[in-house]
Amino acid sequence: DLISYGMGERSIVEIAEALRSGIPVRDITFVRGTVYKTAVQPDLPDAIRLPGFDKIATSKELYAKSFYRQYLNTDPFTAKTLVEPYPADNLFLVQNPPQKPLSTEEMDAVYALPYARAYHPDYEAAGGIPAIEEIKFSLASCRGCFGACSFCALTFHQGRIIQTRSHESLLEEARQITQEPDFKGYIHDVGGPTANFRQPACKKQLQHGACQKRQCLFPEPCPNLEIDHSDYVALLRKLRALPKVKRVFVRSGIRFDYLINDKDETFFRELVRYHVSGQLKVAPEHVSDGVLRMMGKPQNSVYRRFAKRYKELNAEMHLDQYLVPYLMSSHPGSTLQDAIRLAEYLRELGYMPEQVQDFYPTPSTISTFMYYTG
């Protein structure tokens, strides 16, 4: 068996080429971004041997060590092959290092394929998929995220190195969108996991990968972090200028701590003036600094500084636009007192949330590891 993990475009091509050349599936053990199983103990001197499944299933300490090793091996530049034994089945699970990030040209090629831009006809009988309305007229401009929130698995799926499409690729897709019969002039979103990440966190990442034991934004922005929204500003200006486009919104996650630390306010100002559809949703997640530390999020004072400036810019531009915070309850490490503080914060805002996010464990996140191990 062979599994492609992460964003598998390059892996799929390499697997197909191997099959076309006559290599049996069982011998395709060399493709990055894949996992395979074998009954023979792999002869891989540089591989990291993880504790066997039987051991991590019964020992939280060994599970913690295994997860940490996996987490440190998610970067394509530094990751090693991981081997996990399954003694009960006489098998070994082998995970090859992740694929290298796609280049801009490769990203453009992926998004230039003739997608139907619709759900499969089989869903018609069930009334379709309502969620498609939100993404049908949206543009995916980037991939990856160096935010590294504890409750998010993006580090495992897309990695911490930002990959972007070219302006022309996005403009061409936008032109295609404007030709859709039900297009009303509104591009709903231009973003990705984090909308305002359009470049790697620093130049080092392109040659050496992301730091293994240091985050880009937490607990404080790294001194090497390059904060620059100029490319995103230029892209949004071009999209706004397209014929048939009335408004271009940014609705996917804006990383407010990255934004508020940009000394150039051009993007912040244009975001408020042109790209908010009545309310801007951001994710402070909590108000207790103790919980935020567990989440890998900035201190609450950073969000308050952002919210204050957002309010000031709206007043300056004579706009009445709301700021809607995403908040999470029950995160590991949260106490009853923390929950009360969160409730009091909502009371102070006079805000009754329509949607509530209560933590639940999901695979491949630090928060789930905390939840399970205590």
PLM region descriptions:
Residues D1, V110, C145, L170, ...:
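Conserved, mostly hydrophobic/aromatic
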